[in-house]
Regions:
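Periplasmic plug
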Residues: 177-225, 238-245
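Beta-strand-rich domain onsets/edges
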Residues: 21-36, 42-45
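Short, acidic, small-residue-rich periplasmic hinge/interaction motif at the N-terminus
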Residues: 22-27, 56-58, 92-94, 111-153, ...
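A short, solvent-exposed loop/turn motif at the edges and junctions
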Residues: 58-64, 86-102
């Protein structure tokens, strides 16, 4: 009780101190006159209101800065308490001419309306010519980073994905995940409206670049925060596309058809003879209505293996009624939603070389593996949104969603494990193809085991969910930080069935008496349901600048599983793989009760929160304290022959949170966040039972596991210097886990079998990491030159226990026969990326770039190993526009190198791509484009992963070299 009282006392003192400091800052900025000015900004051509326009007030005659604001959602701005004198207002926004308005405040002025200021495009008409200054590629406004699309040259007919890859500070990984200055993008919007929910591929692969005017990226607040004005800490990074004004007038259609073929040898020639892609988009973007229909199909997507994809989708949104006065984005009724179908089939091939760290480095485990897999997926999903505002004080939001999916997959793999590095002990270079040719005495000396396996899975799942929110404001003024009552409820229900088959054949070179063949068939039906509810009351103080929120939330879930495992016979003379897919008609007689699992898992989490907020012109501060009673229970647990009755656990956690933001100007700000989160180990982890379904990787539960506490601290700084057109972003974070759960590993060097058991690590810094990202962009004064650079660095500390020796009877205890040794792995990573671009108006764009990434890994057990890796590349890109038929020629070439990897993975890849296009028809509406990727057929894909117990290098085989011919209309 004393500890809780101390926390509460510190909480109140800190908030009181900050509140006093905020009042001090506010007085320094407060104007002391009696005149108020107001105005509104709109687009000169369309008369649409413009939000986030920078409004700066300067005093005459010395042009000293007095005050600055930005326009609200309705385009309005207000500056209060001006002194008598002469001033001028300056309105500025990316892509528009700066507007200056002179004004004079005299003694009797109280309210002085400026009127409507019309913002013109950043172009000046002289006779029949247009002189247009090139716009800066990036600009910061508040927390929003904006990209001017015209500053980035892409081939005609390109889609959003082609453009985003070239934006400074943006990275797209092999899975399509987008990061902007280290922040992961979770949603794409069009003119502020959701576009196909969280399915980013619908936007990335379908929206043509030629309709986009600007891309904004910012942290979008949750529905709860947007309708209540109360921060709940739930934000997501989004890309918001602004459509060109002349594209708002009617229907927009775009068609793209392409054919091609792979060049050179590849590992998928039997399945893929030719390449194709097709895309049809139909869009209508208006002020209050959006409609999109997309269809595309292709088998030329780059990534792991080869993939055939087909997508169909419809998206719509509609604002009904007139917006409420001075609330541009608040309509009486807003409806929207989407439905989409995704179908794909893929083939993949990968190889890996891994090392498991053991307590004696001379007997480390080295494993080579090759796997091939096939996957088929089909899904239909959709979500909707209904937002109803009977008046300005009441908002009701309902979001339903559903999904139905069917998938099947199959894979085959082969592996071999050695007790020493095979590249040093033998002359082999293609281990998996050559190890069987080794003399028996050598294989029995350095070989540990080999495994061949085949797996297949058939899955189906159905899901339905909904979220309902209602918020009542008791203060109808524009400031939403008033008294507020809100209720939030959600539910979800999903179920399905998974049928899997697995067959494995193990040979142990040191213990041939343990050679085994296993053939198993699993049926696993699931039924899950979740419900949650939250109620929050917010009470304002000090004219709404300070508020106190009290909330209660309950979350309940129930998961039912009933996995049935059948051990199929392995007898007689047969070809192992031929019988793998055979399922006996009398399946029930092979049911194995020891390997089957039946359980009902129930959780109930309660959250009681108190949050104090303080908002001023420059400072936003929030401090909260959460009390979380948590219940977890498992009923009717049956597994591996054990029958366990009701098992439950109750834990109460206390987690603080602090959020601080300081804003010097609308373009310069600092944000600091600290959060703590608790998590419970799963009930499966806590059960003292052993699972040997994979004979080489056996797992065992630990009933003594304790909950973990994760602490995170993050810092974000952003600044845009308008005079020199420089953008600076800095992100830093520190995270650690108290009582973190790591796997204790027992490794048997005779058989290569590993037994893992989860356990809590002691100490505050047993598992922690820190990272930082700094990015810089600059456009030079004549706007022909621009540069961008980014630096990232990270450190990670991981701990786990390991033991080498005979495992013995693992059903009785894990790790018997010797003491475990602490294995610590520390990883330092650093990277630098830079590019320089020259653009001569619309004719030539030339870019040179380079990057280097370094990873240093040290392990306390494997002290003699060099695990440093280097990845570096350098090259350039050129785009040339010719006056004849709007012809474009583009080419890029990069040398990509790897060092420090296993075997043949160290290599230099010279990657050269080229494309050419020309336009036809009226208005250049038709485009013919030819593309040649990886002309030298030299690209390869390799990555490394490191943990506290081992490292692994993996190579994925792809079709990288191919030609495509497009016709786009």
């Amino acid at each position: 009780m004393n500890r809780r009282f101390q926390l509460l006392t510190i909480f109140v003192l800190l908030v009181s101190l900050l509140s006093a400091q905020n009042n001090k800052v506010e007085k320094q900025q407060r104007l002391t006159g009696r005149a108020n000015i107001s105005g509104k900004t709109v687009d000169y051509t369309t008369d649409e209101v413009m939000s986030q326009v920078a409004v700066q007030l300067f005093a005459l005659p010395d042009s000293s800065f007095v005050y600055g604001v930005t326009t609200d959602d309705g385009g309005w701005f207000n500056i209060k308490k001006l002194n008598v004198g002469k001033y001028y207002l300056r309105m500025s926004f990316l892509g528009y001419q700066t507007q200056d308005v002179n004004l004079e405040i005299v003694k009797d002025d109280r309210e002085k309306p400026i009127g409507v200021i019309k913002m013109q495009d950043d172009a000046i008409m002289l006779s029949e010519a247009v002189i247009q200054e090139a716009l800066p590629p990036t600009q910061m406004v508040e927390d929003t980073l904006m990209y001017n699309v015209d500053a980035f040259k892409v081939p005609d007919g390109s889609v959003l994905e082609d453009l985003v890859k070239r934006l400074p500070g943006v990275e797209i990984d092999e899975n399509g995940a987008i990061k902007v200055n280290g922040q992961t993008v979770t949603r794409i919007l069009v003119d502020g409206q959701e576009y196909f929910g969280n399915d980013q591929n619908m936007a990335m692969k379908n929206i043509p670049v030629n309709i986009i005017d600007r891309i904004k990226t910012y942290r979008r607040k949750s529905d709860f925060t947007r309708i209540t004005g109360v921060e709940d800490g739930e934000e997501e990074t989004v890309l918001d596309l602004r459509v060109k004004k002349n594209m708002h007038k009617g229907w927009l259609s775009n068609y793209d058809a392409a054919l091609g073929y792979p060049v050179g040898e590849n590992d998928f020639s039997e399945w893929l003879k030719a390449l194709y892609s097709g895309r049809v988009t139909l869009n209508r973007f208006q002020a209050n209505t959006q409609f999109s229909m997309n269809a595309n199909t292709n088998n030329s997507g780059r990534g792991g293996g080869v993939r055939k994809n087909t997508q169909l989708g419809v998206n719509f949104s509609k604002n009904i009624g007139e917006p409420y006065p001075r609330r541009r984005n608040e309509f009486p009724l807003v409806v929207g939603g989407n439905i989409r179908w995704n179908g794909s089939s893929s083939r993949s091939l990968s190889e890996s070389e891994s090392e498991t760290f053991t307590t004696e480095y001379t007997s480390s485990s080295f494993r080579n593996n090759r796997s091939r897999s096939n996957n088929e997926n089909n899904s239909v999903s959709g979500d909707g949104r209904i937002e109803w505002r009977p008046d300005t004080s009441l908002t009701i939001v309902f979001r339903p969603s559903f999904s139905v999916s069917r998938s099947n997959s199959s894979s085959r793999s082969g592996s071999v494990t050695f007790n020493t590095d095979p590249y040093q002990a033998t002359d082999m270079r293609d281990i998996l193809n050559e190890y069987m040719n080794l003399p028996a005495e050598i294989l029995d000396s350095i070989g540990v085991n080999s495994q061949n396996s085949a797996n297949s899975n058939d899955n189906n799942s159905n899901q339905i969910s909904g979220n309902f929110q209602i918020s009542k404001r008791f203060n109808k003024e524009r400031n939403s930080n008033g008294r507020n009552l809100s209720v939030d409820m959600s539910f979800s229900k999903n179920g399905g069935e998974s049928i899997s088959r697995s067959a494995t054949k193990q040979e142990y070179y040191q213990r041939h008496d343990r050679d085994t063949i296993m053939n198993r068939y699993n049926v696993n039906p699931t039924d899950n349901s979740n419900m949650s509810g939250r109620i929050m009351w917010t009470e304002p103080f000090d004219s709404g600048r300070t508020s106190l929120s009290l909330s209660y939330q309950i979350q309940a879930s129930k998961r039912e599983t009933n996995r049935q495992t059948y051990v199929l016979p392995v007898t007689g003379d047969y070809e192992f793989w031929d019988q793998h897919w055979y399922v006996p008609s009398e399946l029930q007689q092979y049911l194995n009760g020891e390997l089957s699992r039946q359980a009902t898992n129930v959780t109930r989490n309660h959250t009681i929160s108190m949050t104090l907020r303080r908002n001023t012109e420059k400072i936003n501060f929030q401090m909260g304290l959460n009390i979380l009673p948590q219940y977890t229970g498992m009923d009717n647990f049956k597994y591996m022959g054990y029958e366990i009755g009701d098992t439950s656990r109750v834990v109460v956690n206390y987690t603080p949170s602090i959020s601080f933001r300081y804003r010097w100007t609308r373009q310069k700000s600092l944000r600091i966040n600290m959060n703590s989160r608790t998590s419970q180990p799963s009930m499966e982890q806590m059960m003292d039972i052993t699972d040997d379904s994979n004979p080489l990787n056996i797992s065992k539960g630990n009933p003594g596991l304790l909950p973990t506490l994760n602490n995170s601290l993050s810092l974000e700084f952003s600044n845009y210097i308008e005079e020199s057109r420089q953008t600076i972003n800095l992100n830093m974070s520190l995270s650690n886990t108290l009582r973190s759960i790591s796997n204790k590993t027992d490794y048997d060097p005779e058989t290569g079998v590993s037994l893992t058991q989860p356990m809590n690590m002691d100490g505050f810094w047993t598992n922690w990491n820190t990272n930082g990202n700094f990015s810089y962009q600059k456009t030079f004064k004549n706007t022909k030159y621009r540069m961008s650079a980014s630096t990232n660095a990270s450190f990670r500390h991981q701990e786990a226990y390991m033991r080498t020796g005979s495992i013995g009877n693992y059903n009785e205890s894990a790790g018997t026969g010797g003491a475990a040794v602490l294995s610590t792995t520390e990883t330092v990573s650093a990277g630098q990326r830079a590019s320089f671009t020259y653009r001569d108006n619309e004719w030539v764009e030339l870019t040179v770039n380079g990057n280097i990434n370094f990873n240093h890994n040290e392990n306390s057990v494997r002290k003699d190993g060099n695990m440093d890796t280097y990845n570096f590349s350098y090259g350039g890109r050129v785009n040339v526009t010719l006056p004849w038929k709007n012809a474009h020629i583009a080419s890029d070439i990069n040398m990509s190198s790897r060092r420090g990897y296993s075997g043949s993975y160290n290599r230099d890849d010279l990657i050269w791509n080229a494309s050419a296009s020309m336009s036809f028809f009226r208005g250049n509406s038709g485009t013919l484009r030819i593309e040649y990727f990886d002309i030298l057929n030299d690209e390869s894909n390799v990555n490394r992963s490191v943990s506290a117990t081992g490292r692994s290098d993996t190579r994925n085989y792809n079709i990288n070299s191919y030609i495509m011919v497009h016709f786009i209309y």
